[in-house]
């Protein structure tokens, strides 16, 4: 399967889920690779992002298409919702896209009729800036909670759990979704 569909008037490509993620603490400072209570809480003044290595090829494809000189309008067709908005905004940010007209396609189903309606009625991407801001905020909260509480609980209780389970090392993973399920 090709990674791009080309037509005379359009080029179509896709993300494969998330292409960009928040960087681990050691990308801010290599000393943070070693977990220590003295480095907690980890709260960066500015968040860093990186391309996910396993999907780097697709990111390069999407990035190069978004930045092509002959592309003047981008139709953003990621999932209609906060996470879909976040997926596109991270790609756009990391790819340093600028000077393009950006329209958001918002659809409620995958029928041909609904897709065509979504394209016809696409709105300027800026109308979804609040949704994007909420997605970034949710991601930062998840990141800070996960990084800090996982490290804290692992440092405090990891050895006890390892001894109980008779394993060499135990990481206690904490996160918004995981914690609710537990």
What is the predicted role of each segment?
Residues 2-151, 180:
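Intrinsically disordered, low-complexity regulatory segments
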Residues 142-182:
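Prokaryote-biased recognition of long, low-complexity C-terminal linker/tail segments
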């Amino acid at each position: 399967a090709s990674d791009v569909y080309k037509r005379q008037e359009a080029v179509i490509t896709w993300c494969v889920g998330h292409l960009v993620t928040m960087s681990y603490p050691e990308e801010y400072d290599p000393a943070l690779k070693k977990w220590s209570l003295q480095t907690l809480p980890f709260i960066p003044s500015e968040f860093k992002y990186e391309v996910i290595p396993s999907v780097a090829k697709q990111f390069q494809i999407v990035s190069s298409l978004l930045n092509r000189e002959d592309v003047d309008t981008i139709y953003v067709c990621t999932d209609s919702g906060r996470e879909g908005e976040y997926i596109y905004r991270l790609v756009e940010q990391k790819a340093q896209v600028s000077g393009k007209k950006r329209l958001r396609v918002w659809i409620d189903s995958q029928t041909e009729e609904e897709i065509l309606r979504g394209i016809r009625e696409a709105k300027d991407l800026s109308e979804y800036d609040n949704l994007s801001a909420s997605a970034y905020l949710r991601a930062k909260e998840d990141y800070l909670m996960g990084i800090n509480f996982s490290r804290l609980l692992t440092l405090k209780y990891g050895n006890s759990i390892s001894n109980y389970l008779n394993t060499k090392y135990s990481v206690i993973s904490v996160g918004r979704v995981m914690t609710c399920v537990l």
